[in-house]
UniProtKB/Swiss-Prot annotation:
Binding-site positions, ADP: 156-163
Pfam families: Kinase-PPPase
Keywords: Kinase, Nucleotide-binding, Serine/threonine-protein kinase, Transferase
Name of the protein described by the UniProt record: Putative pyruvate, phosphate dikinase regulatory protein
Keyword Kinase: yes
Alphabetized InterPro entries for the sequence: Kinase-pyrophosphorylase, P-loop_NTPase, PPDK_reg
Family: Belongs to the pyruvate, phosphate/water dikinase regulatory protein family. PDRP subfamily.
General function of this protein: Bifunctional serine/threonine kinase and phosphorylase involved in the regulation of the pyruvate, phosphate dikinase (PPDK) by catalyzing its phosphorylation/dephosphorylation.
Protein's organism: Lactobacillus acidophilus (strain ATCC 700396 / NCK56 / N2 / NCFM)
EC number per UniProt: 2.7.11.32, 2.7.4.27
Leader peptide range in chain numbering: none
Length: 278
């Protein structure tokens, strides 16, 4: 198993015999409680036989600081994952079996271990899969055309929760693109072409950003007192972002001391979307 001194960098492995949406949603919701952690999500969906599972376990051995979250219906698929985690002394979370066991003990019924039984394969389900793929494809302004196709566009300086928010909202069937804001850099013309209502400007308190960025530098073993983490630089970034938000006439949210869920709820309310409808 690969090792690293940087305990703030975490690789969350999601293994599922279906799409893995439930496991992914659990992972992102839990990870939102650790804003200073740099988290890489590695999804392995539709792992339906032992051969595929063995390939996954061999591949993830190279990653450091692992947490495995799995949703596997069949016992024969669960056991190798649990054994792998035990042998490598890593944390492993089964999000499916405890619920099945609780229902079984209460009803005295035997589960049929049918893969995918929990999903209704309707259009809403497939839309959510598509939204997840969209969020990954258009993260960090990778392709400006995504702004025109998105339901929501998130703008914000570094460390304002753009990516976790994108993924959280994608799980609500929303296509989300985001753009990091850096002073004196070009803003894609597409940003000015879209409806301002679907643009969300994210900001933060300078002191909160300062602490987050300092901790990020420390996590990388670097000097925390850099231009990136200086109050002067942070204030300039926030002022530049605020000027853009005013120019666009977009909705602005301060994410300081707010969870991902709280910020997402404000966005859904602004868009007139009932959370439960998604």
């Amino acid at each position: 198993m690969a090792e690293t001194k940087d305990q703030n960098v975490l690789n969350i492995i999601i293994i599922s015999d279906a799409a893995g949406d439930t496991a992914f949603s659990n992972a992102t919701a839990a990870a939102a409680e650790f804003p200073n952690a740099e988290i890489n999500y590695r999804r392995y969906p539709f792992i339906t036989n032992l051969e595929k599972l063995d390939e996954v376990l061999k591949e993830i051995e190279k990653y450091p600081n692992l947490v495995i979250i799995f949703s596997l219906v069949k016992d024969e698929m669960q056991i190798p994952v649990i054994k792998f985690a035990r042998d490598h002394n890593i944390q492993c979370v089964d999000i499916f079996s405890p619920v099945v066991e609780a229902i079984q003990q209460t009803t005295h019924m035997i589960p049929d271990q049918k893969i995918g039984a929990q999903h209704s394969l309707n259009q809403k389900y497939f839309d959510r899969i598509s939204a997840m793929e969209f969020a990954v494809m258009y993260d960090d302004g990778k392709d400006p055309k995504g702004f025109l196709e998105a339901d929501v566009v998130l703008l914000g300086v570094s460390r304002t929760s753009k990516t976790p928010l994108s993924l959280f909202l994608a799980n609500k069937n929303l296509k989300v693109a985001n753009l990091p804001l850096v002073p004196e850099t070009h803003i894609p013309k597409e940003i000015y072409e879209i409806d301002p209502k679907k643009i969300i400007g994210l900001t933060n308190d300078p002191s909160v950003l300062n602490e987050i960025r300092r901790q990020r530098m420390i996590a990388y073993g670097l000097n925390p007192d850099t231009t990136y983490s200086s109050m002067d630089s942070i204030n300039k970034e926030l002022e530049s972002a605020q000027a853009l938000y005013k120019k666009l006439g977009c909705y602005v949210i301060n994410v300081a001391h707010r969870s991902i869920e709280e910020t997402a709820a404000l966005i859904l309310e602004h868009l007139g979307i009932d959370d439960y409808a998604k």
